Amino acid sequence: MTNYRVESSSGRAARKMRLALMGPAFIAAIGYIDPGNFATNIQAGASFGYQLLWVVVWANLMAMLIQILSAKLGIATGKNLAEQIRDHYPRPVVWFYWVQAEIIAMATDLAEFIGAAIGFKLILGVSLLQGAVLTGIATFLILMLQRRGQKPLEKVIGGLLLFVAAAYIVELIFSQPNLAQLGKGMVIPSLPTSEAVFLAAGVLGATIMPHVIYLHSSLTQHLHGGSRQQRYSATKWDVAIAMTIAGFVNLVMMATAAAAFHFSGHTGVADLDEAYLTLQPLLSHAAATVFGLSLVAAGLSSTVVGTLAGQVVMQGFIRFHIPLWVRRTVTMLPSFIVILMGLDPTRILVMSQVLLSFGIALALVPLLIFTSDSKLMGDLVNSKRVKQTGWVIVVLVVALNIWLLVGTALGL
């Protein structure tokens, strides 16, 4: 009886510790369902039905492994990826990495900020510029939570992630997809045209986020409680749950677009405004409203995450710190410029996701090198299978990007 109580008590303690360590992956996961995903997934689903769902499945599995490696680096070394690059690489390489990481972070924030502004425009009937102002105010308010520590921010962003997931369950019910075709699209690879390759690269860029690779290692580098192995075990659960939710949202997003638009003849829907307006007569006003609300939630939470990632990148690479409100103000400017110039916001969203896909390999290569170094990682060093899988992911990403560049240059 005594042994049972001891085991029960230790089991409760282990569960309590796992719960206490939950959260960092939810902040990372929100980057995987930002408005860039909305734009790319809607275009892919409307244009090609269920044919590109397999890209989402494999990209999400890759993302799970990548985020586990990023989190593991922080746990094992007490330093984030940017700091490790700074400590191990020559200064010119470090400065190159910092510049490209800042560009990637700003491209990400552009997509997220404009996406939230579009969401406000759709559900409130305001102008895009007014939506951008509302987005700026809302993100400043959310960032103020950082003053109270990481946990309050994790709870708010985790709540927004769950809201977006719930919203897309509702959208799935409204759209009534063909489950047999949906399942086929998830498991059978298909890239029927050069446009499909372009969108596949965009889906990859929208699903595997370079800036979140840097951020996640910083969120776990100061975790406390239990042994390193226990913290790593809890982190794997954290990543598995958060990334499964994010992957589900991306799948449902593309499947909903396929069911609602592609199979009703609206294959040219490539604009978030058009998607919202088309949903109203096809499904219902409620479905369109849920779409708008989920876009706002995804945009607000992911633009906050983008701001945090930019801060980590700057501090890690060049040891320079600026207040979060200053960074938020500066990174809002490109979004306002795009809006004031009257550029197509949805096209900007998709292009930003393609740009992101070029930053994945640059973040992945050092991540794999560091996490495969037994001197750095100790007992958390990568296994041979993980190393091999990681390099396969790098090769796939680079190959897809080369295919995209050649196809674009030749006008294929």
Swiss-Prot record:
An MF annotation (GO) of this entry: manganese ion transmembrane transporter activity
GO biological process, one term: iron ion transmembrane transport
Keywords associated with the record: Cell inner membrane, Cell membrane, Ion transport, Membrane, Symport, Transmembrane, Transmembrane helix, Transport
Subcellular location: Cell inner membrane
Membrane topology annotation: Multi-pass membrane protein
Segments in the Periplasmic topological domain: 40-51, 119-125, 176-196, 259-276, 345-350, 407-412
Family to which the UniProt record says this protein belongs: Belongs to the NRAMP family.
Function statement: H(+)-stimulated, divalent metal cation uptake system.
Name under which the protein is recorded: Divalent metal cation transporter MntH
